[in-house]
């Protein structure tokens, strides 16, 4: 979609065109709210999410997105309430547990902590759900200074996550060999030091392009 390639104006135009055809289409409304969130138009995004929920209170996608938005702007109590609402609808959506854990200071009597332990032992969860739940329990045990239990859960989360990622080190190894070979071949290039051309440095955030620009300049 246009939103995924940062063509926000075009994406918004198409969403609004869709709403002219079907003004109550929750899927389009949710996408429009997500777009507003990306553009830091948080009040508009909140209004749209609430519009969806006024018609469909159990719209999990809208609840989740609104909860995340409240978390982003520091409205943690509102965020936690919505994540708990998700768990009432679908207790297996353990990403909500993980998000709640980031906003909670746990002791061993905390009801949510007890619920997560019971969920781990009593429910049949997918690997993805287990990843989120183990991360949440890792945080909860860390709050209680039970570092062995915390490490155990973080390790389980990372081990399952690694399995799900299907990461192949050999692919990256071959890729870096090609990069190294290409870099070494640059020594054979004859440069015309008398020519002057504009050089544009383009890169992703945090990719080192600012440092590259400083070195060249």
Spans of features found by a protein language model:
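Alpha-helical solenoid repeat scaffolds of the TPR/TPR-like class and their adjacent stem/linker regions
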Residues: 1-217
